[in-house]
Amino acid sequence: MDYLKAINDKFITFEKLILTLCTIMLVLAIFIQVICRYILMISTPWAEELARYLFVWMSYLGGGYALHSGGQIEIDIAPTIINYLKISDDSKRRIILTLKTIGLAITVIFILCFCYVFSNYIMFIYRGVQTSQTMGIPMWIVYFPVLIGSLITVWHGIYRILLNIKMGKGDN
């Protein structure tokens, strides 16, 4: 399990670096857009397009980090109900852990299906000649970080499933 933790730590470092760079670029693009529009009175449509793409990239690349840190949206009605049951605390913990593991497995399966469909879409776009309107970037490059972020989310989901299984066996 230690080698998986090392791989996961590398992914986290990579994600933090990419998200930090995207945030800096996003702030700079918006800053340039505001300065050019309101002070220099010139239009910079590329800055708006870049900011839009960076925001989408950050959303998908940040999804894996959110899953890793437990920051994703989840419905916790089942754990709340289970905590009111008159069973031992260990049984409650195991049931809640099992439900969370099942939820993670469903999430991973859904994202894998999304990755399959989206990779076919990217290949379709790659064969075409579509480019972004203002910057002229090939659209497959624009969409590619969505696939990468989804695959990283799958990795974090599988890693958390393995951690839950390890915790369920009592190997803390």
Locations of regions flagged by a protein language model:
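Alpha-helical transmembrane segments and membrane-interface helix-loop junctions
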Residues: 1-172
